[in-house]
Design a protein with these regions (language model features):
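A short, N-terminal "cap"/entry segment at the start of jelly-roll beta-barrel domains
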Residues: 1-68
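Ligand-binding pocket scaffold of soluble enzyme catalytic domains
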Residues: 80, 103-105, 110, 138-139, ...
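Double-stranded beta-helix
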Residues: 1-16, 128-156
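Conserved short histidine dyad/triad with adjacent acidic residue
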Residues: 52-59, 70-88
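A short beta-strand-loop-beta hairpin characteristic of the jelly-roll/cupin
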Residues: 81-84, 89-117, 127
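A generic fold-level signal
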Residues: 64-68, 88, 136
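Conserved hydrophobic/aromatic beta-strand scaffold that supports enzyme active sites
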Residues: 71-75, 93, 112, 120-122, ...
Length: 156
């Protein structure tokens, strides 16, 4: 197999520095009332990798990615997290980077597991799910989405 060796300057397009990632909440400012937005999603999300061939719900990623794939870091204050929702065709994988989270699933969120730093859970398509920061500090959750990026449905 033939390989390539990018220059350090060329590799910079594949580096995402957390402090430089824009908060996606700014993308919906003025379009969705802040109170409603915070019920639907994490306090802020920062897109790391996203497809370059279409606009994603989180905006373009700093690092270009393949179709139907995104990496987002969700920032949640204690008690914060999105509402119960499902993705018909998308697998969502959560890894706790900071604080502690509860991941709930089921049509009413009747099942749950708590995860701590570096613990990971992958939720398959078609399962109602939500997450919330149950720690005392700001939480960071690494979220990998694999599948159609606009197939979300919120619980009634």
């Amino acid at each position: 197999m033939r390989t390539t060796t990018p220059t350090p300057e060329e590799m910079e397009q594949y580096v995402a520095r957390f402090e430089d990632l824009p908060a996606n909440k700014d993308r919906t400012a003025g379009k969705i009332p802040p109170e409603a937005r915070e019920m639907m999603t994490a306090r802020a999300t920062r897109t790391v990798i996203a497809t370059v061939d279409k606009d994603t719900p989180w905006g373009n990623g700093v690092i270009p990615g393949p179709s139907n794939f995104a990496v987002v870091i969700a920032e949640c204050e204690p008690g914060n997290g999105p509402g119960l929702h499902s993705h018909a065709h998308t697998t969502e994988t959560f890894t706790c980077l900071q604080s502690r989270f509860v991941i709930e699933w089921g049509d009413k969120g009747e099942h749950s597991v708590k995860i701590g730093k570096f613990d990971t859970i992958s939720v398959p398509p078609g399962v109602m799910r939500r997450f919330a920061n149950i720690g005392d500090e700001r939480g960071l959750l690494h979220v990998t989405l694999q599948g159609p990026l606009r197939d979300v449905e919120f619980a009634p």
